[in-house]
Amino acid sequence: MTVNPKQTTFTRKRYNTLAALYDAMEFGIERRQFQRWRQHLWQDVQGPRVLEIGVGTGKNIPFYPPRVFVTGIDLAEKMLAKALLRMQTIDSRNNALLLMDAQTMAFSDATFDEVVSTFVFCSVPDPVLGLKEALRVVKPGGRLLMLEHMLAEPPALARAMTYVDPAIHWMMGVHIARPTVEHVAAAGWLIDQVTPLSYGAIFRRIIAHKPN
């Protein structure tokens, strides 16, 4: 599997364009649901060395546990710039933010103890490739902790999501009809838990680990 330069460039440009308004666009759902889900996910992080894929504007930064070293990466420099501002609001001595493509990470094999991502693999151009890279850079037995929105379980809703997915992707750079649980397994992760968080299981929490 290789990176698709055209799709990767499109995604980077789309999120750089959206960066200025991104937090405002998600303000409502962030306050109602996402914030609570993020906090609960990060409470389960053990570390000590953690990779956050797709740090975005830094919405997870307030929940970084003080006992771990978090390295956050993002594809879009304007999103990362906002995350750097958020990093200044916490004790950031144990953390780092880097501009990097999740599909081609510069880290050595088995660098991290855990990988965290929240609402990211809906926009990675090749999600299986990105998840394979995550598997490569985590230690044997290391965990993947995810929040993600994906293709709904009810057939009628799934068909509707699939129908509008191309338009949503063009406007927002995100896919809303991906079978993300299948992608995690296809990348080589062993799935431990999938927890539906909303109607139709559109939003789910996924916990998986790398085989020893």
Predicted region positions:
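N-terminal, positively charged/glycine-rich alpha-helical extensions of SAM-dependent methyltransferases
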Residues: M1-A20
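C-terminal alpha-helical "lid/dimerization" subdomain adjacent to the S-adenosyl-L-methionine
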Residues: K6-T9, G28, L145-Y199, F203
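Conserved alpha-helix/loop element of class I SAM-dependent methyltransferases that forms part
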Residues: E30-P48, K59, F63
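A short glycine-rich, Lys/Arg-flanked "PGG" loop and its adjoining helix->strand segment in the class I
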Residues: V128-P140
